[in-house]
């Protein structure tokens, strides 16, 4: 970026010129890293800390950011402001040091709000589908030549990054309700995909509190802004009279303003018709599987149509959509050792979904696209509180696969909760008599324990939000073949 471009960007918020060095605590998180990437490209000095390297920290280092793989007071030296993720506790040494040095400490969403303040902000909120919908909106705007800035919670595969600095007035961002910090945002357009009980510790266990927080978020829209909401969701339908802003609805429902009809899935693609008020019907080919992704696309089309984007650009973007990292992410199809004398293959798919509704949508997409496959899931529950609160829902959803391997709960810093562990969940599922789940206590043994349940015509879903994505990549690297101890040592 040249000096003139940088000066123009910094003039958006003149007071931000006083800020030179921005430090991120928990910089390896996708949402944090995305904002850091945009700011690095705007010319700010970026530093950050996390516990281990990952693709996000590697990308930031390539842009000149200083990354510390520890949390020490000296890491915040000379910082103008410290940005923290919701996963960081208040007693973190860097946060304590920043307070002592009277350095401002702000949450991620506050910095995102500053980026959005004088841009045309499009914020995508909801319990499920935020990341993919953000990527779809970004892809359509890019295809239309509008050069948007985007900040996403997952890797946008077409761009190879979580975030990108554009040179237009548009900023498209995923809005995080997990800590209610999306209330800092003041977008021009807001999408709400759905509302379900999740992150309930933030909302004192009160679902009414969660619903009111979404209403408060929508009230951050100016009176001339627009809410785009999925009317298929019963909670959203209930809340519509309280929105108080111009609203476009979408869904499979007959009364949706943007309506999905005639949905069919063929392999990884969805084919459907979109009906819009006072507009020609669109015949859509979407390069993403599942009815849930048709809904995500309908939301993106609703926003793009309101902006006046050409239908041909919309259709091109959806047909060529490359998806996001760890969202029904196809890692390969691998040959297997002959089973009963017959050679076969197994497809490997990595998916981030960790709420029962998300897991259910992934299973349905797999069944619809590959109905003859033996569906095997490797599942890692995420957080003891979520496992406890949604225990029966998990048990019901996970019985839909043909074979299930379950890893221990990924704690994400939580203390264990009796009865909300993987062993208990396996026992409950087994008691329902549909499948016999296998508990895998050692992640290194996944490939070995997979082998006996494969038939030679398999689709393996590696599912969860913890560190299970690394297991998926390892399975792809070894091509699903169990390794000997010697191979593991030399791998």
Swiss-Prot record:
GO cellular component, one term: cytoplasm
Compartment(s) of residence: Cytoplasm
Xref: InterPro entries: Mur-like_cat_sf, Mur_ligase_C, Mur_ligase_C_dom_sf, Mur_ligase_cen, Mur_ligase_N, MurCDEF_pg_biosynth, UDP-N-AcMur_Ala_ligase_MurC
Residues annotated for ATP binding in this entry: 126-132
Domain of life: Bacteria
Pfam families: Mur_ligase, Mur_ligase_C, Mur_ligase_M
Catalytic activity, EC: 6.3.2.8
Keyword 4Fe-4S: no
Molecular function (Gene Ontology), one example: UDP-N-acetylmuramate-L-alanine ligase activity
Family: Belongs to the MurCDEF family.
Official protein name in the record: UDP-N-acetylmuramate--L-alanine ligase
């Amino acid at each position: 970026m040249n000096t003139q471009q940088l000066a123009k960007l910094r003039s958006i918020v003149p007071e931000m010129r006083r800020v030179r060095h921005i430090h991120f605590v928990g910089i390896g998180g996708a949402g944090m890293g995305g904002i850091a990437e945009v700011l690095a490209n705007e010319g700010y000095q970026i530093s950050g800390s996390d516990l281990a390297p990952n693709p996000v920290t590697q990308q930031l280092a390539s842009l000149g950011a200083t990354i510390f793989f520890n949390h020490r007071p000296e890491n915040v030296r000379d910082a103008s402001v410290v940005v923290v993720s919701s996963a960081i506790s208040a007693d973190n040494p860097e946060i304590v040091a920043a307070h002592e040095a009277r350095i401002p400490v702000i949450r991620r969403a506050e910095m995102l709000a500053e980026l959005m303040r004088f841009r045309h902000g499009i914020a995508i909120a909801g319990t499920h589908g935020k990341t993919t919908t953000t990527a779809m909106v970004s892809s359509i705007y890019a295809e239309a030549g509008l050069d948007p800035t985007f900040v996403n919670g997952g890797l946008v595969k077409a761009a190879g990054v979580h975030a990108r600095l554009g040179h237009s007035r548009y900023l498209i961002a995923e809005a995080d309700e997990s800590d209610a910090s999306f209330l800092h945002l003041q977008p021009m357009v807001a999408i709400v995909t759905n509302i379900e009980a999740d992150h309930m510790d933030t909302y004192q266990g009160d679902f009414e509190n969660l619903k009111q927080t979404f209403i408060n978020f929508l009230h951050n829209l100016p009176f001339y802004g627009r809410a785009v909401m999925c009317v298929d969701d019963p909670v959203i339908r209930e809340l519509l009279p309280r929105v108080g802003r111009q609203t476009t609805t979408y869904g499979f429902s007959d009364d949706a303003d943007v309506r999905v009809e005639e949905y069919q899935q063929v392999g990884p693609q969805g084919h459907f018709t979109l009906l819009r008020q006072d507009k020609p019907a669109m015949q859509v080919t979407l390069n993403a599987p599942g009815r849930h992704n048709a809904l995500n696309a309908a939301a993106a089309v609703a926003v793009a149509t309101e902006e006046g984007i050409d239908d041909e650009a919309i259709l091109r973007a959806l047909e060529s959509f490359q998806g996001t990292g760890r969202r029904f992410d196809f890692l390969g199809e691998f040959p297997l050792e002959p089973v009963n004398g017959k050679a076969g293959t197994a497809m490997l798919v990595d998916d981030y979904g960790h709420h029962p509704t998300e897991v259910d949508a992934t299973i349905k997409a797999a069944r619809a696209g590959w109905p003859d496959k033996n569906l095997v899931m490797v599942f890692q529950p995420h957080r003891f509180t979520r496992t406890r609160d949604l225990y029966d829902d998990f048990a019901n959803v996970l019985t839909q696969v043909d074979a299930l391997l379950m890893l221990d709960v990924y704690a994400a810093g939580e203390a264990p909760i009796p009865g909300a562990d993987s062993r208990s969940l396996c026992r409950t599922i087994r008691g329902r008599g549909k499948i016999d789940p296998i508990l895998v206590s050692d992640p290194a043994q996944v490939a070995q324990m997979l082998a006996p349940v494969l038939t030679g015509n398999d689709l393996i879903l590696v599912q969860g939000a913890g560190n299970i994505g690394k297991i998926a990549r390892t399975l792809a690297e070894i091509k699903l073949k169990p390794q000997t101890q010697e191979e593991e040592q030399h791998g």
